[in-house]
Swiss-Prot record:
GO terms of molecular function: phospholipase A2 activator activity; ubiquitin binding
Main location group: nucleus
Renumbered ranges of ARM repeats: 550-592, 593-624, 625-673, 674-719, 720-759, 760-799
Name of this protein: Phospholipase A-2-activating protein
Native organism taxonomy: Eukaryota, Metazoa, Chordata, Craniata, Vertebrata
């Protein structure tokens, strides 16, 4: 085993113990703080999960609990911290059967199973209050609260291999096979991080503002949550599967397909530990700094810095013997091209290495042996026998990784004997001449070498056929390799609860609008509670809030004025204007008559005027939509979709603010009657997505209308058992409350929050996990209007 000391010291990691039990690959390990001492949980392709605890006073661990519940390979594991509902915490595992199983510490069978993903669940992360984030090959992330799915994160175009929750800020991270990382807040994608050149496989949070990612491109990147990549770490020579931080430190450990774990101190790889297994899938760090590693040979190995916990001499020797007998394919390591005749003999090992983990090849009895330098022990240690060679003698169907991409060959080209050598990657499907030309261009080499390089490629690949990997077996599933985006399941986004499409989180569209804050249509803005403030004065609110004030004569006068400017084919005759006058009269005074079909037909024609002329017509619609006949006409099952689409089009962030405002108020007033309420619940995804887009419009009246619309949604959702709908509305409220500043809008958002969570423990816990309490606390110091402070106090007491 290779060892290396930290900078300025002799400390290095050595084997503590090897744990046998799993029968196939160990795919995930997680520190288990639920158990006193240094316990951890492992999961495997053998379909089992196991809880391991220290075997005091020995150096090893014993298997305390074996858990089963998956019908296929188990891919990932995480620990849910203690909560009011489960004071001892829980263990969650994700599997190839598309399910998440949740266990207690003393249960062999799941307490409950989370269903909803449509492909392998490959990553899990826990947050506060029982929140769980999962990632899947179905390209989505899902947020769970106890046994319910609260929201689905859609936006990636390939498998979500890694997830992580930043609980203090209510943020979530997802890493994907589409090479991107996304930052989510309250169910919406706030930022996409680009830079990795291949699948993102692992994530680790450093603090509230920084995190690490690892990738199939053989690199680790350090990011700020604001988007900047601070540093890139290179050292591994193949896919990096996992990254894990040391306790209270920015140092970390990584595992890779190159058969190694690597320990990084102060940004440098200070120790490389080779394992006698091809794929080192996973790792976790215990509170005492010991490293737990799971690999493709089914063995869990624990490494320690502590002299008190190091394995016996016999155990270490057995480990090194096993390592020395391993066979190494040069295409999977950092061995370079091998020319057996040019290799030195054993005498070459008398020269010390220059860095920890340095690899040296020697020729011994006709075989090629690989040795690795251990700085900590000051010796070369055999890490295996090299089988085959890279370059012209490649005979296997394997692929070579170079700069994060796979190739059939990676040649070493010495164009000039006195100059440096260069790597030339090549796939058998490529044109040798084009590859040679690009190689010379990239390395700024003389074009006169074109024929020579192209001929070299042709000569050294003669008789070979393109690698199709038809025989490849995925080490996770046992089937063919997962190709990002090629899932065999249907990823059309069907909602697991409704059968309809999921809410797709939208990103904010930045716009800078300026508008007078005065409301030209309704006068005073403030919604006032019908009773004096008492502990129950504000929520749950049970009746929709509407915009009722109107001046029919002014509205009709403006209509007549704009009618003169309308295109000839759109102008209304005097008789039609009279119909609108009658409609307004009935809408304002329901006892004054009945609404006629002619009046409704005229209204629909006038609201289809050009957008710069329609705002008084929209005001007629806003007032009259509260009438049951008008509401039924526009919001019925047959016509409702067209009506909703029309208003949503007017709410475009690039549209006119008067139209945006009146469209929002029309939606608010539509809740007054059952047809409108039903329509808006059906159209909730589209409407709330548009609400989020409009939050940056700089107009307080629009913000008040947005808040009122969400309040009316909260009133509807309070009456039904729809946790996903409540999660969606909570997400929208959390997004809008970050932006708006008008205190009347804030008040209505607070009432909406209180209405949503009243009497619903799940909604209350979700609000906590989204960090809503910190948003509420910002307004506790408001003294006027007093209702804002009072709502904040009541909400915080509930949470």
């Amino acid at each position: 085993m290779s060892q290396a000391g930290r900078d300025g010291g002799d400390s290095c990691y050595r084997l503590r113990c090897s744990l046998l039990g799993h029968e196939l690959d160990v795919r995930g390990v997680a520190r288990c703080p639920l158990w006193p001492g240094e316990g951890f949980v492992s999961v495997s392709r053998d379909r089992s999960s196991r809880l391991w605890v220290p075997d005091s006073p020995n150096r090893g661990f014993i298997e305390l609990q074996r858990m089963s519940g998956h019908s296929n390979f188990v891919s990932c594991v995480c620990i849910l911290p203690p909560s009011d509902l489960y004071p001892r915490g829980l263990i969650a595992t994700g599997g190839n059967d598309q399910n998440i199983c949740v266990f207690s510490l003393d249960s062999e069978k799941p307490l409950y199973t989370l269903k909803g993903h449509k492909n392998t669940v490959c990553s899990l992360s826990s947050g506060k209050f029982g929140t769980l984030l999962s990632g899947s090959w179905d390209t989505t992330g899902k947020v769970w609260l106890n046994d319910k799915c609260m929201m689905t994160l859609q936006g990636h175009t390939a498998a979500v291999w890694a997830v992580k929750i930043l609980p203090e800020q209510g943020l979530m991270l997802t890493g994907s096979a589409d090479k991107s990382i996304k930052l989510w807040k309250a169910g919406r994608c706030e930022m996409t991080f680009l830079g990795h050149e291949d699948c993102v496989r692992g994530l680790a949070t450093i603090n509230d503002t920084e995190f690490l990612s690892c990738s199939n491109d053989a690199s680790v990147r350090r990011w700020l949550i604001t988007g900047e990549c601070l540093q890139i770490y290179y050292g591994h020579t193949n896919y990096i599967y996992s990254v894990c931080l040391f306790p209270n430190s920015q140092d970390f450990v990584t595992t890779s397909e190159d058969r190694s774990i690597r320990i990084w101190r102060k940004g440098e790889c200070t120790q490389t530990i080779r394992l006698p297994a091809q794929s080192v899938w996973c790792c976790c760090v215990l509170d005492n700094g010991d490293i737990v590693v799971g690999a493709s040979d089914g063995i869990i190995r624990v490494f320690t810095e502590s002299p008190d916990r190091i394995a016996s001499i016999e155990e270490i020797q057995a480990f090194e013997n096993e390592l020395s007998k391993a066979t190494i394919d040069p295409k999977t390591g950092d061995l370079g091209d091998i020319k057996i005749d040019d290799l030195p003999g054993r005498d070459h090992l008398n020269e010390p290495g220059t860095r920890d983990g340095q690899t040296r090849l020697i020729k011994e009895d006709g075989k090629v042996e690989a040795y690795q330098w251990s700085t900590g022990e000051g010796r070369w240690m055999k890490i295996g026998d090299v089988v085959g060679s890279s370059g012209a003698t490649q005979q296997t169907s394997g692929r070579v990784l170079f700069e994060g991409k796979e190739y059939d060959y990676v040649f070493t080209i010495d164009v000039n004997e006195s100059g440096p050598s260069h790597k030339l990657p090549y796939n058998l499907t490529e044109d040798p001449w084009l590859v040679a030309y690009n190689f010379l261009q990239k390395n700024d080499l003389n074009p006169m070498f074109l024929d020579q390089v192209a001929k070299f490629i042709i000569d050294n690949t003669a008789g070979q056929t393109p690698s199709t990997n038809l025989g490849y077996t995925d080490p996770l599933t046992g089937g063919g390799r997962y190709i990002p985006g090629s899932s065999s399941t249907d990823n059309n986004g069907a909602d697991p609860f409704t059968g309809g499409n999921r809410y797709v989180p939208g990103s904010s569209l930045q716009s800078d609008y300026s508008a007078a804050a005065a409301d030209p249509f309704t006068g005073k803005n403030a919604y006032r509670s019908s009773t004096a403030p008492t502990p129950n004065a504000y929520f749950p609110k049970t009746k929709p809030v509407t915009f009722d004030q109107a001046n029919p004569s002014q509205i009709l006068g403006k209509l007549k004025e704009l009618n003169e400017s309308a295109p000839e084919e759109r102008k209304l005759p005097e008789e039609d204007l009279m119909q609108l006058d009658k409609l307004l009269s009935v809408a304002v005074n329901p006892s004054g008559g009945t609404v006629t079909a002619q009046q409704l037909d005229t209204l629909w024609r006038v609201v289809n005027w050009p957008e710069d002329l329609i705002f008084p017509a929209l005001d007629v619609l806003r007032i009259s939509i509260k009438n049951p006949t008008v509401n039924e006409m526009f919001c019925n099952e047959k016509e409702g979709s067209q009506f909703s689409s029309y208003l949503l089009q007017l709410m475009s962030p690039s549209g006119k603010q008067a139209n945006q405002l009146l469209a929002l108020r029309t939606f608010c007033n539509s809740f007054f009657c059952d047809p409108g309420s039903c329509l808006l619940m059906v159209e909730r995804d589209n409407v709330l997505s548009k609400v989020i887009e409009l939050k940056t419009v700089n107009n307080k009246n629009i913000h008040i209308a947005l808040a009122t619309l969400m309040l009316n949604y909260a009133i509807c959702l309070h009456k039904v058992s729809d946790i996903e709908g409540k999660a969606q509305c909570l997400s929208a409220i959390s997004s809008v409350i970050e932006v708006v500043q008008d205190l009347e809008a804030i008040f209505r958002l607070l009432v909406a929050l209180g209405t949503l969570i009243s009497g619903d423990t799940n909604a209350m816990q979700l609000a906590k996990s989204l960090g809503v309490d910190s948003q509420i606390k910002k307004y506790m110091s408001v003294t006027e209007p007093a209702k804002v402070n009072e709502c904040c106090r009541l909400l915080l007491n509930m949470l």
